[in-house]
């Protein structure tokens, strides 16, 4: 069983006003109030949110690379890498497909678009042309080829997580294969992990500012009132996503011996950060640290979390089928069982090809509708105004899906320390990771 050294002292519990989740809550509330009462002024704070997300993306590649390389190089059997990857992909495929089916079922039961009687010819197709154009770039072959970087260092100057993952896995395997000759390199990378983790901690201190700027801009630009016309669709999506996390992921968590609600409480600071920035990537480095600290194997965390950010998008999948059927209902487009099965199959593929794409949910929806001509792509103009408000829910659901997946795959691999997991989920102070302890000493 994987065990993280526990010689480091447990961190003392901080006063509530110094804890990240409290600071982010205050920032979000302040952003909402400013956006509602001073919308024009609030829009000027957009650079705060953009800057914070850029800062986090700056550190994502080093965190992923160091975590994966040191994890794989420390494995005694390289066959373990392939086994972890296959188990993770099997999990991702099953639950991503289940999320698509859930979105489709809810759309049939709730009928959010029924009675709107929209004529597609009356819609402003120009509003969605940009998204449709980007969707044509999402092909399965192009997606696969894009995983392979042009040079060994190019992934570190781009924003494609899968390229970093690809290089890290290959380098980690190579380092493990050279044995003792690679020890100096491995020791150097393990030492380098300490300042990188320290930098993550420094950047996270700016999270409240980022959340404030992002939410103030969103409310200021789009307004709370913009939700009213399509509140039924938005409400259906939020409730469905909540039920998916609590019921579906909750059932899986219970089978594996933990509570998804306790896991959400443990990750509350990261969830609030995702809510404020509308980007699950903003919490990726912190998620990797926390899952390892909670007893998940380092090698499992290094493989499952970054891969899940591209292949395990439960929230995006629920959104895609729910939104597609909403458009069909709103435009009185009749879909046969064959049409819906085709929609499901296309969505299974297109949802995997949007890693690192801005507005991924909307773009993958355009890609799906472009291949299933029965549903008018122009109908996307109906949800363009409220898509931004559904983005937060997509990101939150995606985030929780990846957190649960990490624990589940760790359990399958017997790389889960239940004593650490239970302590973390019960709110007890947890042992610092070796790299974190070294960073504190530094």
Curated annotation (Swiss-Prot):
Organism for this UniProt entry: Delftia acidovorans (strain DSM 14801 / SPH-1)
Recorded GO CC terms: plasma membrane
Gene for this chain: dctA
One of the GO BP terms on file: L-aspartate transmembrane transport
PROSITE patterns according to UniProt: NA_DICARBOXYL_SYMP_1, NA_DICARBOXYL_SYMP_2
Topology in the lipid bilayer: Multi-pass membrane protein
Source lineage: Bacteria, Pseudomonadati, Pseudomonadota, Betaproteobacteria, Burkholderiales
UniProt KW Transmembrane keyword: yes
The protein, known as: C4-dicarboxylate transport protein
Annotated localization: Cell inner membrane
Transmembrane segments: 19-39, 55-75, 90-110, 161-181, 199-219, 232-252, 318-338, 366-386
Protein family: Belongs to the dicarboxylate/amino acid:cation symporter (DAACS) (TC 2.A.23) family.
Domain of life (superkingdom): Bacteria
InterPro entries associated with the record: C4_dicarb_transport, Na-dicarboxylate_symporter, Na-dicarboxylate_symporter_CS, Na:dicarbo_symporter_sf
Membrane listed as a keyword: yes
Pfam families to which the protein is assigned, alphabetical: SDF (PF00375)
Entry function: Responsible for the transport of dicarboxylates such as succinate, fumarate, and malate from the periplasm across the membrane.
Gene Ontology terms, MF aspect: fumarate transmembrane transporter activity; malate:proton symporter activity; succinate transmembrane transporter activity
Keywords: Cell inner membrane, Cell membrane, Membrane, Symport, Transmembrane, Transmembrane helix, Transport
